[in-house]
Each structure stands twice: as structure tokens, then as C-alpha cells.
């Protein structure tokens, strides 16, 4: 009985000891896992943040434009592991570290083998390093040629394994491994040597990259355009080992017998330098200010632009040819931008004729330079006028000497054409009609319109006045491209996009669809310069406008064709003048050279441009642009916005009853047997003067001083042209007697005299077209009225202010 109790006690005691041991083991295991969890949860920087990264700038199709250097002058792209070729990842582990997924950061067998060969047998040094140890050596810049350095490398490898997962360590190694010269990382090497991202590598390329880090200096040598013998031999040995695991890949054996193209580092592309520079600057600014950039795992590696490399090369080629061909005319520099109006993506951008030419300041991005646009803003004056009911495309405007207060614009050719339709005035770039339209605008005027369109750094509206219409302000080429794209997009303004990941913002309506359509239709009627000499018109409609800045510093052409907007500039960045810098002569030929080249390379298709439903066609009298009366001999059609466009019955053609005996206008009552009726053109006095100066005969309506309103049926009232509406005239305090304000007005052909009144007080009489000068006695508000000798009148307010 006692023996049984003793045995039972021994059994219980033994079981207790085993239970205690198991508890200790479990506690130890839990402690280890707890320590591992604590290490993983302890804050530590991502491995990608240990070293700076490069940026691969690519076009919309993924073609490399530029690979930037990291801050430490290395080419180093960070590519996530899931964007690496699986064949490359497996080949690296097969070649470098087959036990990677199982060891704790170091491989005891590998270390022992390396020590035996290096120190005992005296062979070539072998470190026995794992991928983790190689990463540790690079991150901490360790000297591992000594036993102490090797021990520190092992410790650092264990540290990495404690704080990071295997996938994170593998990803970091692949992005940090040396690939010859200053190229680091498999993703970088893939882009540099094979011009492709690492997820698109072929098997021969993947195996070649896998063996380079073991001896990069010998396996990658500069100046070669294919892999050298040392690299090919190492790759093929790895391929033999690869086949033991993947016998199905034996079908690729012929590829391993062929030379493998390998781009030398010196041949890295440097395309679209101005556009890439702008995109990188915008990216850096965005990353500085945007919190979203911190969460963008691919932000440092790849910048996808909206550029099309083929279109970029075409634009660069055409500019280079044009500048070379026109060198004798003093043309040294040019710039251009091409924008797709459908998504506002910049497809090609050339900031200068030669980025590397210091003589022309070639590194300046001309598309961002603020310069006088000349007449390229005129289409928007007319479009605003359409929306505000000032005119329609066939409105007849006056191209005559006109003073708008102190501002008296002249035309580029120094001549005046008299009556001209709005369409012809725009396409022939007449200054006086454009300024008159601008003077009639209310809100928005051109200045407010440009502000709404995002044009920056404008001076005050008072600084420019009406001169803004003719290029008195400064805009950039990119501003112009966005404005012309707005016309193509039916009046909806959207900013340009250079990065593919920039969101396409909702359009902001600045013009009506009707006004935009009419303006485009006007520009479409502008013949290209070589059409006048018999050249064939473009295969697609081209909606274009030229511009020339003051003193011949800038020549511009901007326009729409197919889905694109193209703006070209010819000039000098140092603002030197050249009489050859005229828009139609210097910029338009380059513009159409580019249009023709693009159409030859890819057939351009005109997008649908349906007539807006609110836009109507109306019959007009061609001489006046108004609704035809019964005596109008030539009639046509014009676009018309019901309820907005100004329209009235024409009064240019009128019947006059002629006395058969005298040939003068007959006095009422008329004797039908002794009179007859003829149709005459009644032109205002200012236009009659232009006709006379141009030598264009105009049969004047006969007059008869013996009777009032002899034979005349109707007529237009006079129209005040000075003082200018909305202007304040300054009167100096100590020299009030020197202040004289010019009164002037145009009048109907039937008017012979004009009578001027200020606040209903008669101040003088003059002939139509002659100026009358009035001297105000005090500052204040006045009403100026003019009455012709038929009782027809016009009036407007006048403000006179004091000035020290």
C-alpha cells in the first residue's frame, strides 16, 4: 500500500515538473512573439524613406521622357514589389538567397562557408551575405571586409528582420541593389537599360538584371549597346539553374543565344525639356503643400504627363526647320504649344528653338513668358460683343479715324477701309473696329474677362484702358491656348493639364455657346496665307488669328484645328525688335507648317460642331448688316441670337424723288409726270470722307436748298464719337482755362449741320465730321447733346474732374 502511494507521488511529481516546463516554454514563446510584435508595432521609418528617389517622367503612353537624379546623384526609382516582374524576383532569390523566406536575417551555413573559403582556404573573399545583410550593409554603409564589420552586418540584419516584414525587406533590397555606375535598384535598371518598367521585362532581361548586383562593375560597362560577355555568361548560368525549377521555359533557349540590346546610361532620353521641367516644378510644389502626397506610394517613382512623344518630336522638328530656313531674316527663336481641347491635356510643348543654345536663352520656357499678345485677343472682344448685344458677325462697323477720348488707335497698315463687316474686321485685324466694340462692352469687359479666365499679374484696368484690346497687356502662351480652347469648347473655360493624374475640372462658362460658335465661324473664314497664291486649303477647317506686338517684338498665331489648339510665337527673349516679326508673315507660316505636318502623320478629323439650338439665321442687307428694306439690292445671311443680337431695318438705300427738269431733289408735293424716283446710298459723314480719300466713287444723293426734306424718306440720327462714354476728363486746378474738350459726331448723308448743346445751352455749330472744342468752367457732371439740321439727335453724359 505504501509503495503504491509512493509511486503515485512520484508520478504526480514528474507530471508537475513536465507541466512546469511546458508552462515555461509557452511563456518563452509568448515572450518572443510579444517582443516581435512590439518591434513591428514600434514606430520606425519606411525603408523607402532611407534614401532619396529619382523620378521617371513619361508621356501619356508610358514612354520615358527623362529620368532625374536623386538628391545624392544616383538614379534610384522606388518601385513597389507588386509592380516587379515575378520572374525577376524569383531569379534574384535563386541567384542570391534561396533561403530568404526562412532565415532570421543571416544564414549560418552561408557565413561558415564564406569564412572557411576566405580565411582558411585563402580563396576569393566570400561574404555569405543574405539579401537582408546586403540591404543592411547599404543602409548603414558598413565596412564588411573585417570580422567586426561582418558581425555588425549580422546584427543589423537581425534588426531589420525584427522591425520589418520579409516582403518589405525584399522590396527594399530590389530597390537598393547596385546595377553599375550610379544606377541603383532593379526598377531603375529596367528603365535605364531596357526602356521598360520592371513588370514588363522578358525572361532574358529579368535574368540579366538578377545577376548584375553580384559584380556590377564588370557586368555593366559604359558605351555598350548590348550586354557584354561577362554578363551574358552569368545570365546563361542562372538560366540553366532556372530550368531545373521551370523546365517549361526551355522554349526560350534560342533567345538566350541572341545578343540582348542594352541601352547605355549616356543614351538616357532628355525629351520635352521645358514641359518636363514645368511638370517637375508643379509636382514639387504639390508635394510641398498637399497632404495627399504623403500617402502616394508611387509619387517619387513615376510622373505621367499628358504629352505625346510623337507629337512632341513633330513640333520640335518643325520649329527647328523653320528657324534654320528663316535665319537670314533674323529669326533665331520660336516656341509653341499643342493642346487637346477634349481633355485640355498638353500634347506637345516647345519652350524655345533649342534648349541648349545659350545665345537665345534656350532654357527659358517661352510658353510661360508674359508677353504682349498683339491682336490675338480680338476674337474675345467680338465674342463678348455678341453676348452683350453690341453686334453680330455681319454688323457693318466703321474703320475710320476715331478718337476714343485721348486714345486714337490706328491700323497696322496706316490706312482705313471705311465700312467693314465684323467678320472681315476680325480676320483683317482692323484696330479701330475692335476698339469700338470694346468701348461698347459693359460687364464683363475684356479686362474682367481675362481675370475670370485666370490671366495673372495684370495691372489695373485703368492702366491699360482700351489699349488692352490691341496687346497693351501681357499674357502667356499657355493663357492664349486655354482661351482658344474655350472657344472650341463652346465657351466653357478649363485650365490646361500637364500631369495625367490632374483631375479634369468642370468648365466655367465665360461665353455663351452661341457667341463661341459665331466667333469660330468668323475665324474659319480667314484664308491661310498661301491660299491667296493658289495653295490648297487645309483638309480640316482651321480657325486662326495672328498677332503682332508693338515695336515688332513678338509674332503670334493661335488657332484651332481638329481636336487641337496650337499657339506659336516667333521673337527674341531679350525683347529685341525685328521688322520681320509680323504675325501673318513670321508666325502664320510656322503655324500652318505644323498643321500640315500633323495631318500628314495622323489624319485629322473635325470634331462635331453642331449649331447651338438658340442660334438662328436671318436675311440681311450686305451693305449695312441690317434687315433689308425693299430697296436693298444685295442681300445675304447672318447668324443672329434672338433677343440679344442688335437688328433693325437698313436705311442705307433710300428712294429720292428727282425733278426731271433740274436734276435736283424734288420738293413735295410731287408731280408724278415731272419727277422720277432713284435709289441712293446714304452713308454717314465719316464714311463718305474715307470713300473720298480712297478714291472710291459714291454717288451722293442730290440736294435742294429750296425745300426742306427734299425727296428724302428717312435717315439716321447723328452719333457722338467724342467725348467718350464713361470717361472722366481731367481739368487742372491752376490751369482751368487750358482745358478744352473735343466734341465730334458722325451724321447721316442727309445732314448738313450739327448743333451742340451742353445742359441744353447752345455752345456751337459745326459740319458733320468737324470737331468743336468746348471749355468747361467748373468740374462736374454735364449732358452733351447734338442735333442735326433735320432735328435728329444724340446725347451722352460727360464727367469733368479736378486734378492737381
Model-derived features: where do they sit?
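Flexible, acidic/glycine-enriched loop-and-adjacent beta/alpha segments
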Residues: 80-131, 184-194, 199-206
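Non-catalytic, structured segments within soluble enzyme domains
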Residues: 123-313, 410, 448-461, 466-471, ...
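Terminal hydrophobic membrane-targeting helix
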Residues: 41-87
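Soluble, non-transmembrane domains of envelope/secretory-pathway proteins that act on or interact
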Residues: 2, 36, 58, 246, ...
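Short pre-catalytic segments that frame enzyme active sites
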Residues: 63-77, 188, 215, 221-224, ...
Amino acid at each position: 500500500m505504501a509503495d503504491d502511494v509512493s509511486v503515485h507521488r512520484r508520478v504526480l511529481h514528474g507530471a508537475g515538473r513536465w507541466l512546469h516546463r511546458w508552462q515555461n516554454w509557452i511563456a518563452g514563446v509568448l515572450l518572443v512573439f510579444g517582443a516581435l510584435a512590439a518591434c513591428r508595432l514600434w514606430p520606425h521609418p519606411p525603408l523607402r524613406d532611407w534614401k532619396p528617389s529619382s523620378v521617371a517622367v513619361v508621356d501619356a503612353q508610358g514612354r520615358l521622357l527623362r529620368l532625374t537624379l536623386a538628391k545624392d546623384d544616383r538614379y534610384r526609382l522606388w518601385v513597389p514589389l507588386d509592380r516587379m516582374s515575378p520572374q525577376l524576383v524569383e531569379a534574384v532569390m535563386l541567384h542570391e538567397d534561396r533561403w530568404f523566406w526562412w532565415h532570421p536575417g543571416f544564414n549560418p551555413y552561408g557565413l561558415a562557408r564564406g569564412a572557411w573559403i576566405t580565411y582558411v582556404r585563402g580563396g576569393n573573399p566570400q561574404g555569405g551575405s543574405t539579401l537582408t545583410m546586403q540591404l543592411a550593409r547599404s543602409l548603414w554603409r558598413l565596412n564588411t571586409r573585417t570580422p567586426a564589420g561582418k558581425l555588425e552586418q549580422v546584427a543589423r540584419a537581425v534588426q531589420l528582420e525584427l522591425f520589418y516584414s520579409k516582403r518589405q525587406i525584399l522590396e527594399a533590397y530590389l530597390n537598393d541593389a547596385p546595377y553599375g555606375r550610379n544606377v541603383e535598384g532593379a526598377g531603375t535598371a529596367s528603365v535605364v537599360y531596357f526602356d521598360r518598367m520592371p513588370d514588363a521585362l522578358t525572361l532574358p532581361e529579368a535574368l540579366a538584371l538578377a545577376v548584375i548586383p553580384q559584380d556590377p562593375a564588370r557586368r555593366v560597362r559604359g558605351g555598350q549597346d548590348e550586354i557584354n560577355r561577362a554578363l551574358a555568361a552569368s545570365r546563361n548560368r542562372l538560366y540553366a539553374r532556372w530550368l531545373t525549377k521551370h523546365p517549361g521555359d526551355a522554349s526560350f533557349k534560342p533567345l538566350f543565344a541572341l545578343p540582348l540590346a542594352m541601352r547605355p546610361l549616356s543614351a538616357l532620353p532628355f525629351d520635352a525639356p521645358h514641359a518636363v521641367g514645368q511638370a517637375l516644378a508643379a509636382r514639387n510644389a504639390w508635394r510641398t503643400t498637399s497632404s495627399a502626397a504623403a500617402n502616394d506610394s508611387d509619387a517619387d517613382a513615376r510622373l505621367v504627363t499628358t504629352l505625346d512623344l510623337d507629337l512632341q518630336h513633330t513640333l520640335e522638328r518643325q520649329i527647328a526647320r523653320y528657324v534654320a530656313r528663316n535665319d537670314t531674316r533674323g529669326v533665331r527663336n520660336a516656341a509653341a504649344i499643342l493642346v487637346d481641347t477634349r481633355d485640355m491635356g498638353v500634347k506637345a510643348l516647345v519652350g524655345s528653338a533649342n534648349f541648349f543654345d545659350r545665345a537665345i536663352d534656350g532654357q527659358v520656357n517661352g510658353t510661360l513668358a508674359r508677353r504682349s499678345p498683339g491682336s490675338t485677343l480680338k476674337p474675345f472682344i467680338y465674342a463678348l460683343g455678341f453676348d452683350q448685344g453690341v453686334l453680330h458677325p455681319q454688323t457693318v462697323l466703321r474703320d475710320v479715324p476715331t478718337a476714343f477720348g485721348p486714345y486714337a488707335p490706328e491700323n497696322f497698315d496706316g490706312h482705313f477701309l471705311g465700312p467693314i463687316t465684323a467678320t472681315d474686321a476680325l480676320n483683317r485685324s482692323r484696330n479701330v473696329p475692335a476698339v469700338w466694340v470694346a468701348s461698347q462692352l459693359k460687364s464683363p469687359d475684356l479686362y474682367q474677362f481675362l481675370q475670370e479666365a485666370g490671366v495673372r499679374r495684370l495691372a489695373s484696368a485703368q492702366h491699360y484702358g482700351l489699349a488692352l484690346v490691341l496687346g497693351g497687356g501681357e499674357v502667356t502662351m499657355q493663357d492664349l491656348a486655354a482661351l482658344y480652347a474655350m472657344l472650341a469648347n463652346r465657351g466653357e473655360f478649363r485650365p490646361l493639364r500637364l500631369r495625367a493624374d490632374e483631375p479634369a475640372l468642370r468648365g466655367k462658362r465665360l461665353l455663351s455657346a452661341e457667341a463661341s460658335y459665331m466667333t469660330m465661324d468668323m475665324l474659319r473664314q480667314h484664308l491661310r496665307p498661301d491660299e491667296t497664291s493658289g495653295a490648297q486649303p487645309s483638309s480640316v477647317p482651321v480657325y486662326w488669328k495672328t498677332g503682332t506686338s508693338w515695336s515688332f517684338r513678338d509674332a503670334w498665331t493661335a488657332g484651332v484645328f481638329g481636336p487641337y489648339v496650337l499657339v506659336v510665337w516667333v521673337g527674341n527673349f531679350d525683347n529685341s525688335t525685328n521688322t520681320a516679326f509680323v504675325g501673318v508673315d513670321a508666325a502664320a507660316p510656322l503655324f500652318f507648317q505644323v498643321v500640315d505636318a500633323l495631318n500628314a502623320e495622323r489624319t485629322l478629323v473635325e470634331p462635331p460642331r453642331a449649331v447651338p439650338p438658340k442660334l438662328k439665321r436671318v436675311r440681311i442687307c450686305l451693305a449695312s448688316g441690317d434687315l433689308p428694306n425693299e430697296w436693298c439690292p444685295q442681300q445675304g445671311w447672318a447668324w443672329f441670337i434672338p433677343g440679344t443680337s442688335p437688328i433693325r431695318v437698313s436705311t442705307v438705300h433710300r428712294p429720292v424723288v428727282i425733278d426731271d427738269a433740274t436734276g435736283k431733289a424734288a420738293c413735295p408735293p410731287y408731280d408724278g409726270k415731272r419727277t422720277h424716283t432713284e435709289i441712293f446710298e446714304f452713308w454717314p459723314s465719316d464714311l463718305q470722307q474715307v470713300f473720298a480719300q480712297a478714291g472710291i466713287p459714291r454717288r451722293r444723293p442730290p440736294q435742294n436748298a429750296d425745300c426742306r426734306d427734299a425727296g428724302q424718306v428717312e435717315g439716321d440720327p447723328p452719333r457722338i464719337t467724342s467725348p467718350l462714354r464713361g470717361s472722366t476728363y481731367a481739368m487742372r486746378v491752376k490751369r482751368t482755362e487750358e482745358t478744352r474738350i473735343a466734341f465730334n459726331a458722325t451724321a447721316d448723308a442727309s445732314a448738313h449741320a450739327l448743333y451742340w448743346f451742353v445742359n441744353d445751352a447752345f455752345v456751337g455749330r459745326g459740319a458733320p465730321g468737324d470737331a468743336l472744342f468746348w471749355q468747361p468752367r467748373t468740374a462736374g457732371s454735364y449732358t452733351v447733346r447734338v442735333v442735326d439740321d433735320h432735328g435728329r439727335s444724340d446725347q451722352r453724359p460727360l464727367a469733368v474732374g479736378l486734378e492737381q
